[in-house]
Amino acid sequence: MSHALMQWLHAPVATVALALLLSTPLRAHAAVEDPFFTALDRYSADDFGGCARLLGELLQRGSRFPDGGELLLVECTAAAGDRSQAMDYVNQLLPSGRLSFDDLLHKDLPGLNALRADPAWPDMRRRVEAAERQRLAQLDAPLRRELLERAARDQAAQHVAIDAGGGDAFKGVAPVAQANADWLKTVIADKGWPTYSMVGRDGAKAAWLIVQHADHDPAFQAEILPLVEEAARAGEADLPDLALLTDRVLLAQGKPQRYGSQFTTAGDGTMALRPTEDMDGLDVRRQAMGLQPLAQYKATLSEAYRKPVR
């Protein structure tokens, strides 16, 4: 995996959803060709123009990008040398709230660095900052802040466990996960599921992370699943998040998972796919939910968890 592609990752390593923004050049082994992940492969190979063309076509067709996809479009376009078009994309995408403010202003990537060095950038930056102020003013700021802080504690505990080799080390995550879930239950009872409109994309992602890691309370996960599904269908949550939570709930109910997102550590230390329905149609289902093909997902997990994956 290239250094540039590793830099692209902005989700925490311990989050299984990190697979959405990681890719390895395994396209020959994929059963389903997905334009977004093909574009990500092009970016990994420094074919910035090819990446920009593919993502630009997806945008024109009104396709729904995985989380971070819009920023990748801006990055590829600017890295390909068309900074004017990249700024046009920024203007077009700002109202959607799907461009990360911090990444746009600070992420160290070749295209974004070139964009920020352009003479037209100061005016663009003022527009970006104004749009961010307007967006934040419409959110439940205290709730968003608490969600982000709790998700950060979850991820810190996950990192400690992964660095310790996993297994029993994950027992240290349990108190954090339980406290977060208990708190989130009170929030949902009072305000409903935290959507993009309520707490922003990062706040909603943090809420999903808390539920995804509440394996001590499968009834809570099952109760939240319809709320996440409703939000995802309304564009207020990510389809990949819905897929991962669906798999978690199905497995807890003793059923095969649907999207092949959940793995277990076998006795030999390798990671193995947990029981999954209709393997022949798996990559088609994954593509429909914005997930990369299974072969690439396995490579992602192997790098993230530092274990062989089969």
Name each model-derived stretch.
Residues 12-25:
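Bacterial N-terminal signal peptides
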Residues 38, 72-73:
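Structural register within alpha-helical repeat arrays
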Residues 63-69, 96-107, 136-138, 236-244:
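Boundary/linker segments of alpha-helical solenoid repeat arrays
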Residues 94-97, 107-198:
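Preference for long, solvent-exposed alpha-helical segments and helix-linker "stalks"
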